[in-house]
Amino acid sequence: MKMIIIFFILLILNLIKSQQYGPTWDQINSRPLPGWYDDVKFGIFIHFGIYSVPAFANGGYAEWYWWTLKNPSSDGGATQRYHEKEFGANFTYQDFVSRFDCRLFDANEWASIIEKSGAKYVVLTSKHHEGYTLWNSEQSWNWNSVETGPGIDIVGELTKSVKNMGLHMGLYHSLFEWFNPLYLADAETGKNPTTQVYVDEILMKQLKDIVTTYEPELIWADGDWMQLSNYWKSTEFLSWLYTNSSVKDTVIVNDRWGSECRDKNGGFYTGADHFNPYKLQSHKWENCATIGYSYGYDEYEQATDYQNATELIIDLVTTVACGGNFLLDVGPDAQGTIPNNMVDRLLEIGNWLSINSESIYGSSPWRVQNMTFNIWYTTNTTNGNVYAFVFELPDDGVLILSDPIGNNKTEATLLGLKGEKGVEVSLPIESTKPGITLNIPMVAPQDYPPYVYVFRLTDVE
């Protein structure tokens, strides 16, 4: 009997490992999302490329420099005027590559900063819409970071450093390239091209190359709006990724695989940039956000253009409370350094997460997402605790939480508030109708934990 049970267990495991996902959206969408992604909650997005050299935008999106330069009407001619003034009318976008030297790039330093931020996964632009790749792509001959510019396999070096830190590595990849002649030739007929030369000769080969070479656990597609998914051959690639690739059991993807796909097909949903619905979603989703106005580095952004740590943590909290992941972007400069103002924000978030990690990592949405905009909840299914995130404490120290139902075993703790000998302080608590009332000790402002207050509630319903 024991041998029969073992046989069936092995059979089931083999069937799971050999799961086949055909090239249809029904098949692709039936694949469960690997659990690691929902557990980690917080990641860092990195936009890095030739656009990091001019580092200019008129109102955001500095990574679109080449497009706005070639299409002056898109930003009122601001980029063109800036370009001609700073570099001259005859200076081409390709000329910037010699200034993309990355001479201060240190993959270990980037990974260390990210680890200290509390982020658990990383998404690096392997190729943005400009077509320049951060690895030695055969399809981007003389337009990649190994053969031109810094002479560095940036994808390879950062992948190694990130994985050595115990973090999950992901790669962003643009499906299309603004000015690639093969794509432009395909696209001449509009939304239903009759040829797919660009897809066959460039896109599919590059996607499979980064998967087989670097084994990322996340593929973040973009440029989806330009064509339907059948042009991009998205289901064919995802069928291979989920069935035959070396990362088939752990990899996760987003939903930007065709103009009809967003919030419908693929893995987690992304919506628009900075998507935060402030309500529970039925499907796993991600909020990709910026600290300032650009994803790529913009040297003209001021300190006042950056969100402060409290604002970013509030975005993280409200995202996680509604079942999402928070992907926060940084844009390194052309020398390969992450700007100090961005590093400061990341370290501040990391400080907060070091105190309140149990309320974020591995958490789930509670039965109520928020009481008001200033009070939000998560729960940890492992320990059964509920966590109340409070953005502003009441002046009188009396905090009324109308949603949790307490009993004589209920306890409340303000995470990070220490009493004598550094021991956590249990707060006086009263069961009220509705909810519970907490009496918060009045201490010096510097003795309260920073940014957003998190209350651990035990034995509540």
UniProtKB/Swiss-Prot annotation:
GO terms for molecular function: 1,6-alpha-L-fucosidase activity; alpha-L-fucosidase activity. PANTHER family: ALPHA-L-FUCOSIDASE (PTHR10030), ALPHA-L-FUCOSIDASE-RELATED (PTHR10030:SF37). Belongs to the glycosyl hydrolase 29 family. It holds the Pfam family Alpha_L_fucos. It catalyses: an alpha-L-fucoside + H2O = L-fucose + an alcohol. The record marks C288 as: May be important for catalysis. This is Alpha-L-fucosidase. Transmembrane segments: none annotated. It comes from the Eukaryota.
